[in-house]
Swiss-Prot record:
GO terms for molecular function: ATP binding; guanylate kinase activity. PROSITE patterns: GUANYLATE_KINASE_1, GUANYLATE_KINASE_2. ATP binds at residues 10-17. Its main location: cytoplasm. This is Guanylate kinase. Belongs to the guanylate kinase family. The gene is gmk.
């Protein structure tokens, strides 16, 4: 049984990374894709765990070889997802999360229309600005740029299958878990998972 591909998108500061990490802690059968990026490593990040950090030259060479399922440029940095790794992980029966922006999501949907997509929103612009400020990673100028980008990004929520509002973290996490659980209980998935039982019941 092949796994399900999930696209998870959100504006910077909406809590996507924290929610996905909490979901992974509770769901061992789910994996998260590690993207390639040309942006610099932030404090606490580990190469190969958070991202595959690479040079712009190497990234463009991989792009030329058609190695990416999707790619996008965000804040002047390039991001991409290895198509071969995605296909291998799904073939192993594992569910896989792609944490990508709306541009990448559009590319993935064209190639893999069966992918499930989830958009995470903050409860307000004020809450989003506060979260970006509390990070302590960016200057006021960068925060203003991120806020402008966020408004543009959030307008694409209508393209997604599911919408999660991250007002209360625990509630948002429950919503995220419910999306994954409902997918696992679909008739076709259950039929594959319990083929032997169904055979005995209908014998």
């Amino acid at each position: 049984m092949s796994g399900t591909l999930y696209i998870v998108s959100a504006p910077s500061g909406a809590g996507k990374t924290s929610l996905v990490k909490a979901l992974l802690d509770a769901a061992p059968e789910v994996r998260v894709s590690v993207s390639h990026t040309t942006r610099g490593m932030r404090p606490g990040e580990v190469d190969g765990v958070n991202y595959h950090f690479t040079s712009r030259e190497e990234f463009l060479a991989m792009l030329e070889r058609n190695e990416f399922l999707e790619h996008a440029e965000v804040f002047g940095n390039l991001y991409g997802t290895s198509q071969r790794w995605v296909e291998k992980t799904l073939a192993e029966g594992l569910d896989l999360i792609l944490e990508i922006d709306w541009q990448g999501a559009q590319q993935v949907r064209r190639l893999m229309p069966e992918a499930q997509s989830i958009f995470i929103l903050p409860p307000s612009q004020e809450a989003l600005r506060q979260r970006l400020t509390n990070r302590g990673q960016d200057s006021d100028e960068v925060i203003e740029r991120r806020m402008r980008e966020a408004v543009s990004e959030m307008s694409h929520y209508v393209e997604y299958d599911h919408l999660v509002i991250n007002d209360d973290f625990a509630h948002a996490l429950d919503d995220l878990k419910a999306i994954f659980r409902a997918r696992q209980l679909r008739q076709d998935a259950q039929q594959q998972r319990h083929a032997e039982l169904l055979g005995r019941l209908l014998a």
